């Protein structure tokens, strides 16, 4: 018997994880709707500002002038430029689809075909909305170590890509190894997919950061090779 997607998404561990993530933060609960709207407007503008200028070149003064909002107000909401970037990063990655958001006919083909589906759509997705992908790329490679640690804690706590449920689907279908701790498999999946997708994207967003140009035929070959290597590592 195979587990359904809904069964996997309703798993107690996932519910517990979401409960932890969604626990209100002291001092930040019950914001006035006007204050919440202002905060959201700042984050949205910050996403574009960071995407266009990078993290280090971005200036809170410029963002303040653009929004006609006092610089002190921005710091009151987010504490620092780093705090604002982390919130922009969270909003960016929360906007991405999860693995199990793939079409039902793709999910029926199994774990590695779901991966293939998303890898083939990577460049199309970034062309449709480049700002969150650029912000995510900056969070992965263009920020200080202290911010990177905070980003890693967020990714571990929230699992925005639905990696844990996706790995359980692969194990339940008999496609992913069950003799290895699933948490380790999730980590391997996240690490390798992040780096490989970034390599596919950066020629479009940051030419020269990775050595391979965006060539559709070469990318198709590299996707096939990547899936072959990943299947050899975690596949049955």
Task: Indicate residue ranges for each PLM-predicted region.
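C-terminal peripheral helix-coil segments that are non-catalytic and often amphipathic
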Residues: 1-26, 121-124, 157-173, 188-236
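Short secondary-structure transition hinges
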Residues: 123-165, 183-186, 212-215
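Short coil/turn segments at alpha/beta junctions that flank glycine-rich nucleotide-binding fingerprints
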Residues: 52-56, 107, 129, 173
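Amphipathic, non-transmembrane alpha-helical scaffold segments
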Residues: 35, 89, 93, 115, ...
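Hydrophobic alpha-helical connector segments
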Residues: 87, 101-131, 182-189, 219-223
């Amino acid at each position: 018997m195979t587990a359904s997607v809904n069964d996997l998404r309703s798993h107690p561990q996932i519910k517990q994880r979401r409960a932890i993530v969604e626990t209100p933060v002291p001092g930040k609960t019950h914001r006035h709707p006007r204050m919440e709207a202002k905060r959201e407007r700042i984050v949205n503008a910050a996403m574009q500002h960071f995407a266009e200028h990078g993290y280090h070149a971005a200036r809170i003064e410029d963002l303040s002038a653009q929004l006609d909002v006092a610089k002190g107000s921005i710091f009151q909401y987010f504490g620092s430029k780093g705090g604002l970037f982390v919130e922009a990063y969270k909003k960016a990655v929360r906007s991405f689809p999860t693995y199990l958001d793939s079409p039902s006919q793709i999910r029926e083909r199994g774990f590695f075909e779901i991966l293939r589906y998303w890898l083939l759509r990577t460049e199309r997705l970034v062309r449709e909305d480049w700002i969150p992908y650029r912000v995510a790329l900056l969070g992965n490679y263009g920020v200080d170590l202290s911010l990177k640690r905070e980003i890693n804690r967020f990714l571990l706590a929230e699992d925005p890509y639905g990696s844990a449920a996706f790995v359980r689907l692969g194990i339940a279908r008999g496609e992913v190894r069950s003799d290895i701790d699933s948490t380790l498999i999730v980590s391997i999946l996240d690490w390798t997919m992040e780096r490989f997708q970034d390599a596919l994207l950066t020629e479009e967003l940051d030419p020269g950061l990775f050595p391979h140009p965006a060539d559709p035929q070469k990318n198709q070959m590299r996707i096939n090779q990547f899936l072959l290597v990943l299947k050899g590592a975690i596949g049955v």
